[in-house]
C-alpha cells in the first residue's frame, strides 16, 4: 500500500490472535503497522509482532527493490512493535536504530541477548530532527501515551504524523467495521487512564499541519481528520460522546434485572435518546467499560454479596476508576435480602473520582421490588432525563 509517493505500508495482519494484551477480545484480528520512508536515506518505522517477522521483512524487501534501509525508528517498545529488532539487524547489520534513552533501556530489558553497538544506535531527544533527504522527521516525545518511552514522528514534507499507538484500533486492516467503535474500545481499555498525557500530545499536534495519520494499529487516516482528532479530544478529556443512559447490572435471581428492565422501559417512554443495558455477567467487560465512558449518565444496579457488592460489579467499577473515570452522573440501584451493603460499597468506590454527580434518587430493594421501589424507579427515570 502506497501512502504517499515516498511512504509505503509494510505492516501485517494477524488473524490468529484471540486476545490482545492477553485480555481484549479481537474477533477481527489485529494489524501491526510498519512503514517505509523511501528517500536518499531510507527509514523503517517500527517492527511488528514476533510471529510475523519473516512476512514483515519480505514486505520491506519487496518495496525497496534491493535498496538497503539506513534507519529503524522505534517509537514504542511494546513487543508487538519491537520484537523484530534483532531479526532486522541480522538482515541489515549496518543500520542505525533510532530511539530515545528509555527506548534503549527497554531494548536491553526485552532482548537480553541483543547487544547494540554504538554505531548501530542513534539516540534522540524531544524535538530532535532527522533529515533523510527531502523528508525531515521531527521526534515528539509522548510519555505515557501509553508507555514512558513513546514518541511520535512528524514528517514535514508529506505532512504525516506517525502516531505510535495513538489513533489505533482493534481489528485487522481487511476487517470492514466502524472506526469509532473499535477505536473507542481500544482507547478506553489501553490508553484511557492517561487522558492528561493525550491532551498534551493533542496540543502539540494542533501546531502541526497534519494531512495523514499513520498509527501502529488500524487504518491509515487520510480524510476527515477533524473527526478522529475530535474523538480523541472528547475521550481524553473524559467528556460525553453520546447522549443517553447506560445501565450496568448484576443479578443473582433475576429481581435486580426486573428493576433494570423497568427503568429502561421508563427511560424509553420518556424519550431518552439511547438506553444501553449491560449484564456484566454475560457481556464483554471491555465493551461495558467502553460504554460507561461513552455516555454521560450511568446507573449501577447490583446485589449485596458476602457483605460486599457482587464481584463482577466490583470489577467493573475498578476498571472505571483505574482509568480516571470522571465528569459523569451516576445513579444507584441496590438489592439485598438483609444487611444491604451494595449501594454504600459502590458509592464509596468512586470517592476519589473527579466531578461525579450523584442522582438524588436511589433505589433500595429488599429481595424483590415493592410499590415504593417502582415509584422510585419512575422518579429516577425523570431525574435522568
Model regions and ranges:
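Active-site neighborhood of phospho(di)ester-bond hydrolases with catalytic His/Asp-centered motifs
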Residues: 45-47, 69-77, 97-100, 161-165, ...
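Structural motif
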Residues: 41-43, 71, 135, 159-162, ...
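Conserved beta-strand hairpin/beta-sheet module of binuclear metal-dependent hydrolase folds
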Residues: 2-60, 64, 152-155, 159-163, ...
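Active-site metal-binding motif and surrounding structural segment of the metallo-beta-lactamase
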Residues: 51-98
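FMN-binding flavodoxin-like domain, especially the glycine-rich phosphate-binding loop
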Residues: 173-213, 217-220, 262-278, 288-385
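Short N-terminal or domain-adjacent regulatory/targeting segments
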Residues: 214-241
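Short acidic active-site motifs
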Residues: 84, 284-288
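Metallo-beta-lactamase
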Residues: 2-5, 98-150, 194-200
Amino acid at each position: 500500500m502506497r501512502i504517499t509517493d515516498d511512504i509505503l505500508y509494510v505492516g501485517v495482519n494477524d488473524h490468529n490472535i484471540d486476545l490482545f494484551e492477553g485480555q481484549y477480545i479481537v474477533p477481527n484480528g489485529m494489524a501491526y503497522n510498519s512503514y517505509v520512508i523511501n528517500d536518499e536515506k531510507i527509514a523503517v518505522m517500527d517492527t511488528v509482532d514476533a510471529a510475523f517477522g519473516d512476512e514483515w521483512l519480505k514486505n520491506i524487501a519487496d518495496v525497496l527493490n534491493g535498496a538497503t534501509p539506513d534507519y529503524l525508528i522505534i517509537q514504542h517498545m511494546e513487543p508487538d512493535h519491537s520484537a523484530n529488532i534483532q531479526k532486522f539487524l541480522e538482515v541489515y547489520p549496518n543500520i542505525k536504530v533510532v530511539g530515545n534513552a528509555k527506548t534503549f533501556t527497554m531494548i536491553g530489558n526485552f532482548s537480553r541477548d541483543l547487544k547494540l553497538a554504538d554505531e548501530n544506535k542513534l539516540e534522540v531527544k524531544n524535538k530532535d530532527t532527522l533529515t533523510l533527504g527531502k523528508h525531515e522527521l521531527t521526534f515528539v516525545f509522548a510519555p505515557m501515551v501509553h508507555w514512558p518511552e513513546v514518541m511520535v514522528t512528524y514528517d514535514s514534507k508529506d505532512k504525516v504524523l506517525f502516531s505510535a499507538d495513538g489513533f489505533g484500533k482493534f481489528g485487522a486492516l481487511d476487517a470492514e467495521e466502524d472506526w469509532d467503535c473499535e477505536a473507542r474500545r481500544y482507547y478506553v481499555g489501553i490508553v484511557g487512564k492517561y487522558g492528561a498525557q493525550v491532551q498534551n500530545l493533542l496540543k502539540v499536534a494542533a501546531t502541526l499541519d497534519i494531512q495523514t495519520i499513520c498509527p501502529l494499529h488500524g487504518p491509515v487516516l487520510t480524510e476527515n481528520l477533524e473527526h478522529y482528532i475530535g474523538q480523541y479530544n472528547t475521550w481524553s478529556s473524559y467528556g460525553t460522546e453520546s447522549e443517553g443512559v447506560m445501565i450496568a447490572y448484576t443479578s443473582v435471581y433475576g429481581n435486580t434485572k426486573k428493576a433494570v428492565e423497568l427503568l429502561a422501559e421508563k427511560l424509553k417512554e420518556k424519550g431518552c435518546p439511547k438506553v444501553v443495558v449491560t449484564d456484566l455477567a454475560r457481556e464483554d467487560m471491555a465493551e461495558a467499560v467502553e460504554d460507561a465512558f461513552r455516555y454521560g449518565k450511568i446507573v449501577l444496579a447490583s446485589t449485596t454479596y458476602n457483605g460486599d457488592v457482587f464481584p463482577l460489579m466490583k470489577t467493573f467499577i475498578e476498571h472505571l476508576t483505574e482509568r480516571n473515570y470522571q465528569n459523569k452522573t451516576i445513579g444507584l440501584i441496590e438489592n439485598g435480602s438483609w444487611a444491604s451493603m451494595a449501594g454504600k460499597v459502590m458509592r464509596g468506590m468512586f470517592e476519589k473520582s473527579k466531578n461525579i454527580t450523584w442522582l438524588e434518587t436511589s433505589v433500595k430493594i429488599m429481595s424483590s421490588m415493592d410499590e415504593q421501589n417502582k415509584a422510585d424507579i419512575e422518579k429516577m427515570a425523570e431525574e435522568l432525563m
